[in-house]
């Protein structure tokens, strides 16, 4: 008798995706982040659902409802901090997942990569809107500053901003619609993640060497299921430690002050995972130029397959490209630091130099290094 997992219409899909899936025998722990992102998404949807049961999306009661969740709801503090810090873990996994893709040339799977870029935008949009919901000072002013950037769009900008606000300022209508979008987007992200996997399984996984692994495949279960479970346990340990020992480590103290449109905080800044993009935005004195640089700082990822000039896929055997890759990582860390600093000397010039270096590395230096490596190998 044939096994039910190979005959049942639903089980067949699960079987071909997670059990009998042929996987390269040499994929390292850098390939764990896909499953970790899936777990992060599940954690966020579940904790978010329980938070939504007690949250009210009204300007008068939003802040109080979050306080009520933390003080009066059974384990409400745990759910709230799991959700807030779960977002940080989500972005850590995202950045490492994208970094892995850049290093090992995974972007050569065009469809999978482009869906991934779309997913990155969707997660960033969701996180931004979620940050507005507690209706603290940083929530309100963050929403005001970031939505205001759309007014830089020629001709339609002002109308567009007022349309998004649902009025002439960030107010009740804005909060209600942000809550609605924040609730629906994770389900869209889950659907996109399904498409992401669908395209990945069309080609099979890449591997550290960047060479074809068709001649050496192993079943996903038990080898990579066990490996994924280890990764998940480490993720849960890290998240639990953060939530139970220092839940406010990555948050902003200003968000414990209720939103006040009449009082601007001294330093308006987003959550840590947006600081690199915020630094790029601030480093250009022109409003429209800054907005374009901000969007392009993420959108440039979609150009990666076209900027690939090397004859090898992975950076595993390309020392010059490796050096530039790690310079890019250091540059992004510098931008993240600058994004959290006030707009004054010397931070302004450091931010501008780091922004120039960011785009130079991706658009010019790395493709040139690849060409140079091709010549060194005399191919």
UniProtKB/Swiss-Prot annotation:
<feature type="binding site" description="axial binding residue">
    <location>
        <position position="83"/>
    </location>
    <ligand>
        <name>heme b b562</name>
    </ligand>
</feature>
<dbReference type="Pfam" id="PF00032">
    <property type="entry name" value="Cytochrom_B_C"/>
</dbReference>
<comment type="function">
    <text>Component of the ubiquinol-cytochrome c reductase complex (complex III or cytochrome b-c1 complex) that is part of the mitochondrial respiratory chain. The b-c1 complex mediates electron transfer from ubiquinol to cytochrome c. Contributes to the generation of a proton gradient across the mitochondrial membrane that is then used for ATP synthesis.</text>
</comment>
<comment type="subunit">
    <text>The cytochrome bc1 complex contains 11 subunits: 3 respiratory subunits (MT-CYB, CYC1 and UQCRFS1), 2 core proteins (UQCRC1 and UQCRC2) and 6 low-molecular weight proteins (UQCRH/QCR6, UQCRB/QCR7, UQCRQ/QCR8, UQCR10/QCR9, UQCR11/QCR10 and a cleavage product of UQCRFS1). This cytochrome bc1 complex then forms a dimer.</text>
</comment>
<feature type="transmembrane region" description="Helical">
    <location>
        <begin position="178"/>
        <end position="198"/>
    </location>
</feature>
<protein>
    <recommendedName>
        <fullName>Cytochrome b</fullName>
    </recommendedName>
</protein>
<keyword id="KW-0472">Membrane</keyword>
<dbReference type="GO" id="GO:0008121">
    <property type="term" value="F:ubiquinol-cytochrome-c reductase activity"/>
</dbReference>
<feature type="binding site">
    <location>
        <position position="201"/>
    </location>
    <ligand>
        <name>a ubiquinone</name>
    </ligand>
</feature>
<dbReference type="InterPro" id="IPR027387">
    <property type="entry name" value="Cytb/b6-like_sf"/>
</dbReference>
<dbReference type="Pfam" id="PF00033">
    <property type="entry name" value="Cytochrome_B"/>
</dbReference>
<keyword id="KW-0830">Ubiquinone</keyword>
<dbReference type="InterPro" id="IPR048260">
    <property type="entry name" value="Cytochrome_b_C_euk/bac"/>
</dbReference>
<keyword id="KW-0496">Mitochondrion</keyword>
<feature type="transmembrane region" description="Helical">
    <location>
        <begin position="288"/>
        <end position="308"/>
    </location>
</feature>
<dbReference type="InterPro" id="IPR030689">
    <property type="entry name" value="Cytochrome_b"/>
</dbReference>
<dbReference type="GO" id="GO:0045275">
    <property type="term" value="C:respiratory chain complex III"/>
</dbReference>
<dbReference type="InterPro" id="IPR016174">
    <property type="entry name" value="Di-haem_cyt_TM"/>
</dbReference>
<keyword id="KW-0349">Heme</keyword>
<keyword id="KW-1133">Transmembrane helix</keyword>
<keyword id="KW-0813">Transport</keyword>
<feature type="transmembrane region" description="Helical">
    <location>
        <begin position="77"/>
        <end position="98"/>
    </location>
</feature>
<feature type="transmembrane region" description="Helical">
    <location>
        <begin position="226"/>
        <end position="246"/>
    </location>
</feature>
<dbReference type="GO" id="GO:0046872">
    <property type="term" value="F:metal ion binding"/>
</dbReference>
<feature type="binding site" description="axial binding residue">
    <location>
        <position position="196"/>
    </location>
    <ligand>
        <name>heme b b566</name>
    </ligand>
</feature>
<feature type="transmembrane region" description="Helical">
    <location>
        <begin position="33"/>
        <end position="53"/>
    </location>
</feature>
<dbReference type="InterPro" id="IPR036150">
    <property type="entry name" value="Cyt_b/b6_C_sf"/>
</dbReference>
<dbReference type="GO" id="GO:0006122">
    <property type="term" value="P:mitochondrial electron transport, ubiquinol to cytochrome c"/>
</dbReference>
<feature type="transmembrane region" description="Helical">
    <location>
        <begin position="113"/>
        <end position="133"/>
    </location>
</feature>
<keyword id="KW-0999">Mitochondrion inner membrane</keyword>
<keyword id="KW-0679">Respiratory chain</keyword>
<dbReference type="GO" id="GO:0005743">
    <property type="term" value="C:mitochondrial inner membrane"/>
</dbReference>
<feature type="transmembrane region" description="Helical">
    <location>
        <begin position="320"/>
        <end position="340"/>
    </location>
</feature>
<dbReference type="InterPro" id="IPR005797">
    <property type="entry name" value="Cyt_b/b6_N"/>
</dbReference>
<keyword id="KW-0812">Transmembrane</keyword>
<keyword id="KW-0479">Metal-binding</keyword>
<feature type="binding site" description="axial binding residue">
    <location>
        <position position="182"/>
    </location>
    <ligand>
        <name>heme b b562</name>
    </ligand>
</feature>
<keyword id="KW-0249">Electron transport</keyword>
<comment type="similarity">
    <text>Belongs to the cytochrome b family.</text>
</comment>
<dbReference type="InterPro" id="IPR005798">
    <property type="entry name" value="Cyt_b/b6_C"/>
</dbReference>
<feature type="binding site" description="axial binding residue">
    <location>
        <position position="97"/>
    </location>
    <ligand>
        <name>heme b b566</name>
    </ligand>
</feature>
<dbReference type="InterPro" id="IPR048259">
    <property type="entry name" value="Cytochrome_b_N_euk/bac"/>
</dbReference>
């Amino acid at each position: 008798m044939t096994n039910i997992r190979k005959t049942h219409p639903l089980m067949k899909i699960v079987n071909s995706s997670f059990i009998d899936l042929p996987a390269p025998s040499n994929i390292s722990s850098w390939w764990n982040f896909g499953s970790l992102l899936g777990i992060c998404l599940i954690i966020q949807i579940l904790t978010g659902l329980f938070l939504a049961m007690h949250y009210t999306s009204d300007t008068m009661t939003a802040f109080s409802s979050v306080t009520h969740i933390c003080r009066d709801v059974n384990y409400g503090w745990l759910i709230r901090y799991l959700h807030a810090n779960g977002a940080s873990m989500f972005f850590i996994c995202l950045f490492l997942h994208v970094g892995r893709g850049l290093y090992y040339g995974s972007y050569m799977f065009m469809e999978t990569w482009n869906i991934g870029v779309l997913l990155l935008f969707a997660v960033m949009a969701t996180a931004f809107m979620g940050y507005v919901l507690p209706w603290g000072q940083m929530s309100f002013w963050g929403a005001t500053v970031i939505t205001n950037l759309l007014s830089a769009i020629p001709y339609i900008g002002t109308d567009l901003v007022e349309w998004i606000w649902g009025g002439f300022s960030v107010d009740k209508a804005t909060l209600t619609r942000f809550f609605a979008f924040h609730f629906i987007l994770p389900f869209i992200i889950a659907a996109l993640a399904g498409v992401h996997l669908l395209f990945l399984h069309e080609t099979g996984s890449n591997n550290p060497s960047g060479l074809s692994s068709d001649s050496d495949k192993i079943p996903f279960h038990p080898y990579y299921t066990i490996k994924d479970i280890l990764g998940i346990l480490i993720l849960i340990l890290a998240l639990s430690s953060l939530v139970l020992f220092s839940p406010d480590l990555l948050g902003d103290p200003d968000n414990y002050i209720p939103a006040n449109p009449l009082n601007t905080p001294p330093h308006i800044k987003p959550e840590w995972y947006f600081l690199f993009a915020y630094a790029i935005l601030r480093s250009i004195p022109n409003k429209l130029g800054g907005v374009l640089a901000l969007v392009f700082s993420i959108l440039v990822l979609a150009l990666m397959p076209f900027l690939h000039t090397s004859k090898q896929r992975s950076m595993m055997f390309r020392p010059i490209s490796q050096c530039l890759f790690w310079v890019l990582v250091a540059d992004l860390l510098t931008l993240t630091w600058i994004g959290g600093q006030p707009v004054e000397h010397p931070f302004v010039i450091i931010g501008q130099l780091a922004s120039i270096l960011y785009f130079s590395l991706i658009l010019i230096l790395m493709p040139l290094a690849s060409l140079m490596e091709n010549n060194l190998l005399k191919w």
